[in-house]
A protein has these predicted regions:
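Sec-dependent signal peptide cleavage junction
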Residues: 1-17
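Repeated scaffold domains used in trafficking and secretory/extracellular systems
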Residues: 43-53, 92-103, 140-152, 183-194, ...
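Short beta-strand elements that form the blades of beta-propeller/WD-repeat-like
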Residues: 16, 49-65, 100-114, 153-160, ...
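Ordered hydrophobic segments in well-structured contexts
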Residues: 73-74, 84, 98, 106-108, ...
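Non-cytosolic head/periplasmic domains of membrane-anchored proteins
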Residues: 93-101, 105-147
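Extended alpha-helical regions
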Residues: 150, 171-249, 275, 281-283
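Surface-exposed loop/turn elements that mediate protein-protein interactions on large endomembrane-trafficking
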Residues: 13-41, 64-87, 115-137, 161-182, ...
Length: 352
């Protein structure tokens, strides 16, 4: 699915990109100064990868001294309550858990085994603590790339069915029924108003189409498409009020964020794992300094056109808040794989 990519530039420093596109630059502390500090649970190594609107972080965890057994866990950022949800079934030492979607009532996650190439998707219902298997797929790619969108009691899961072919499956949470609604190679499903929007990807012709699938009658309509290998859609995202496109431009190796009417918001040399919630956009991009070792994260206020200069760890957004990882030392001094330890960083949480 992801072979449609612009060639990324090497790090050259992009701190001034916002000045060229009409965004005011501010220190990230101006926005995040009221964030509360939340240490990691004692005796646990917890890696938060998803944030719900009710202030609960979800991710993979292990108990220190028992790193061979990982599990899905949650942490209430208001009460600091830490909860184990499910142990990972260790079919090999390369079995991990990836959180695909969280809401106030459900969690969708995958346990994947890179060695045996198996992956199982689960639905966790929070209120009654019930677990349902949604998908059992074999074989899988080495790293799962799964996106989930929701409309009321229907889930739309985009996942690999084999040979780099990604399809979209609809699951009914009330009846348990499911059906394939897009069998062609596709990605980036987003529910916006009364439609499911997604990108149809032809990796042979190197073209992309944006498809609108009606949630009321199931009709599909192509609303936009690229016609050559110089420009193509590589992501869609919504905050519930606006729909954004991420466009790759091979001519100048750039990525452009546009709105649904193709009004350009800004361009950058690299943008991955984008999250758009409320008025904020974050993504992983080009390192702003040659001294930076770990991934560089960006934070933008699209409503007030502010680029917050941010130099700490991963960022998670919800409609109501932000969870960010504050480094306690230079990123180059934190050993690989040891960010989420109390001696190296602290979780910071703030609601809007």
């Amino acid at each position: 699915m992801h072979t449609c990519r612009a060639t990324k530039k090497s790090p050259s420093g992009s701190a001034n990109v916002s000045r060229k596109i009409g965004f005011e630059e501010r220190k990230a502390e101006d926005l995040l100064k009221n964030s509360i500090s939340i240490p990691y649970p004692d005796g646990k190594i917890f890696t938060p990868t998803a944030l719900s609107n009710d202030g609960i972080a979800y991710g993979e965890a292990v108990d220190q001294g028992h790193e061979d057994q990982n599990y899905l866990a949650s942490m209430n950022l208001h009460t600091k309550e830490f909860q184990k949800i499910k142990d990972v079934e260790k079919t090999s030492n390369l079995t991990h858990v990836a959180v695909s979607y969280v809401d106030h009532d459900i969690v969708v996650f995958e346990e994947y085994d890179q060695l045996n190439q198996t992956g199982i998707y689960y639905l966790w219902k929070i209120k009654d603590k019930s677990l349902t298997t949604l998908i059992d797929r074999r074989p899988i790619g080495t790293v799962p790339v799964t996106q989930v969108a929701r409309s009321n009691q229907k889930l739309f899961i985009n996942y690999e069915v084999g040979d780099s072919l990604y399809q979209i499956e609809e699951f009914d949470l009330e009846t348990g029924s499911h059906q394939t609604i897009e069998s062609k190679n596709s990605g980036f499903p987003n529910v916006f108003k009364n439609y499911l929007y997604y990108v149809q990807i032809d990796n042979t012709a190197l073209t992309t189409k944006i498809v609108a699938y009606s949630l009321s009658d199931g009709q599909k309509k192509v609303i936009d498409q690229t016609k050559d290998d110089q420009r193509y859609y590589v992501d869609l995202m919504t905050n519930g009020h606006n729909l954004l496109y991420l466009v790759a431009n091979n001519k100048d190796a750039s990525f452009t964020f546009e709105n649904k009417n193709h009004k350009k918001i800004f361009s950058t040399s690299q943008a991955e794992t984008s999250i758009y919630r409320n008025i904020y956009l974050t993504y992983m991009g080009e390192r702003r300094s040659e001294e930076r070792v770990k991934s560089q994260y960006y934070l933008w206020d699209l409503k007030h056109r502010i680029h917050y200069l941010y130099d700490h760890g991963p960022i998670l957004l919800s409609d109501k808040g932000i969870l960010w990882i504050q480094f306690k030392k230079k990123d180059s001094e934190i050993p690989k794989g040891e960010i989420y330890r109390n001696e190296n960083s602290v979780m910071r949480y703030q609601e809007w």
